[in-house]
Amino acid sequence: MKKLSPEIITRRLANLPTPVFSDDLPVNVRREEIKRAIEQHQVVIICGETGSGKTTQIPKICLELKRGVQGLIGHTQPRRIAARTVAARIAAELNSPIGQAVGYKVRFADKISPDGYIKLMTDGILLAETQGDPLLHSYDTLIIDEAHERSLNIDFLIGYIKQLLPKRPDLKLIVTSATIDAQRFSRHFNDAPVIEVTGRMYPVDVWYRPIGVDDDEEEDAVIQITLPLVTFIRNGRNSNGR
């Protein structure tokens, strides 16, 4: 990996954002366990359901471990819109304008600062970077998010990075996946540890269409059930002050 001067490392450490974590997100309940796993292993598999907070919180956990100082924390997303929105969310949680501590690079858009710590990008962008930087010197940590989607880009990256890791013992890899594929990724990376995180659950109300409605009356039935729903939603927002 490219060696940074002591002066640059000192400056980056001094400017390292201090993340704040919400206990409302299930992934943060396992934060200490995740930190230990990252410290002790080169590869960690995070198995998290939708709503667990893994996408936005894992990069912050890496910051807490002072990752991102020697190189960037590279965080891939399958789609451009996801890379941009996740970057904006993490930047907001770190109270940093987008493009400074946290930036993104997608096709036709590059908002990365030389002083940044977290870089969101599509998996295609990272794959393209391997052509000019085969050892991925720019990164000290890589997060492959939504790996269970198994696109060609993701599969190529997973295979490439496995070959790269012995040449970059300083590089950490975190793979996030749905439940069904976590053990498969673990086996691929020589039985890397798997940490399972539950999703956040929300209450669900079931509203039924009125009984005995003929097809000709369907439009009226939709209105009958929609109006109470609109009233319910408005009252809920007003009671929450929103």
Predicted regions and their residues:
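P-loop NTPase motor module signature
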Residues: M1-R242
